[in-house]
Amino acid sequence: MGNTKALIVGISKYFLSGANDLLFCKNDAIAIRTAFIHGLAVAPENIITCGLTDIVTIDDFMTSLRDFEKITQDDDTLLFYFSGHGTTIDSNHYLVLSDKLISTQEIIAYLDAIPAKNKVVFLDCCLAGNFQVGGSAILDVESTASNF
């Protein structure tokens, strides 16, 4: 039986024009790490936390993502949590890092290529529903709400 592994990203400080600093994303990352450890019994050594200095550059993020991939086994469950700015440009969703945008679709594709049994993505950012995951059902919110 596999283990649960987590990559947690919390970005509070931004250098990009139009991206205001967010006061509590680092706190979100710390709180979700605690929740994963105590609520889901994720071993602390199986958690990579990126953003404890408030800043996550593209280099920091990609290094953490590659490290996350290296610790993953085929039967593991992966948890990816992001707290920070999100934006949409030309109908494409991006996560806003401290120094650069990164396509949410690219991150999903990267995570999808990691051979793990289960993958869960948590996006705590604006416009977080504006991307697609292959093989997932399209949700009709109004129909679901009326049937509820």
Where are the regions a protein language model picked out?
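Cysteine protease catalytic core and zymogen-processing segment of caspase-like enzymes
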Residues: 24-29, 33, 87-148
